[in-house]
């Protein structure tokens, strides 16, 4: 593409985003969609039109795995490499596609037509193996479908003209409860919230913007906050912070002149094995957007963002259509449902393949057009969030729950679940079971009950809440899902007795190493060292000494890492060592220490090049008797 054409593309995109540097990620993403990559000419033009240094633009582009500063194929194919995809044979399918297309994994074909590589979990664990082609998901891969895809690529058929069945993504709702069975019509929760305002409060609200709030003791936003606190709603993204307290802290945060409050929905569902938010945004988008609007009413916000993970690119247009319908129905925009000053709107920002952006401060950095590096805390987002202004960040499921609370009340919600864990939890069930999909339960459900419901047999282990969570063995299946026992962001991955739990942990370790943002040395280096140790064990060179090294790494990562990724990176290894040690011991040699690689094997290529195979061309391994052992 000529430089003039690239400049024209950049100018159109930058103009659409009002020449706003905080939209850097969105601008880069759209330029890449038009150019297939981000050429140097595009960076030059962005520097000139945005007034942003080239180094900063390149730094942002280089941070996100879905942005390319080197040419990629016209067809960019990424195989999902979550453990469930591995179990379903994704590597063999990738090898088959590469063979059909005469291409090496991780490379671009000589004609520039196609590139094939792996990526982290794409949120299709219940219908894998899966891949992304030009950011669109293809599910239920088989050898036959791979052959068909290869033929389509060779014939240069545009992705938009591929069979629609390839891109079918199902909800797979297996067990609904109050949220997944909800029949709430758009606007019901907002009208219910308005009706809770006492008559004196309603009179006051008619004279005030919801941004100003109401006098002490009156209803409106304060009443809505009370309902959320009465419900004992806690965050559904994994941390479990009390939602009402977070909203109240943001509401009470002082504003400087020209500042405002923001509502952010974290839809960067990157934890391997989790896909509940995908379904909520596909079939319950009104519930989520209504919850965001309820939050805006409660804290006095005028502007909201949905941060949608790049792997869910296929949801962007449908979600924007829902937002536009809500604007037409006066459920977004100005004077929402007739509330004077009830001005609130939502825009969608698309991520670009960075797991760390699931952390709320890293997500805010990304929203501001920067690298997704977690911030130092305090200060917290409720006082210094987006653009250093008060911001609440909640999970998709949390906002959906808030809408139900606004509709039916806090006492109704608090009566569901357990004393410390109110409401329900949606579990993303995948792996070795007959019926993978979404299961919604009141908090307090046992692991065994979920296994029975999904048709799991001969279960060896369950990984709850993804790699950063906990691995549960059969003698623990009576434990329950809840903040008082096993909290979870939603992943529930099942492994039967045919699975090697060492390889499961190794897959998770590779994931953490790949997704480390690189900001802090302990995590950047520590996850690489952990990966190397697991690979050493995989190659049959492990020893008891390596377990000691893993413990040391865990202590370092726990105490020195900047964010939760480093803190939890050793979890899958330590859990499986403790509960499935034989899976590790079969990879070990019977000595205190073993080198990480075979020196003699490393010389094989040199022997082949020189044509030598005599004794002097080999490393002689000395055998020590017991009396000479080191």
Where are these regions (language model features)?
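Feature of Fe-S/electron-transfer and energy-metabolism proteins
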Residues: 1-630
